[in-house]
């Protein structure tokens, strides 16, 4: 779920090794192109087509830190149905969080004990009713074994579609969702289990 590749760029600049995964080849190619610059450090970037629910090429307890910003169900579709594994094609929220739980279990497997996993997640509306998608996802990460270290609220500014939604919210009598949650989870170290 590398998306546009900005995390990979920052990792390269900051001399961090990074493994970038996505099921969408266009996202991976965009990331590869964005990494075509020189830096004076020894950072390594690994860009792999892979479903986050099955990262078999990564060993147990191999990863030091996870940072991900998965789709919020089908709010934004990152492929138009042509990629079966694309989580952004799932409309039903319960089905979506069932699949995210599989991601959480796999992230727990690959993360080293005592290390952290950060996930940026927002909420949505269905039939004009607020859907706490972020909290449903948080619950699945907790169920997978993670502990919640922090819930950082990120305010959203200057979103591309804000004008459209301001008009729609006034017409339909609902408030805009102006925040996302950055959940920081920790995998217990083996001495604390």
How would you describe each model-predicted region?
Residues 1-193:
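Class I S-adenosyl-L-methionine-dependent methyltransferase catalytic core
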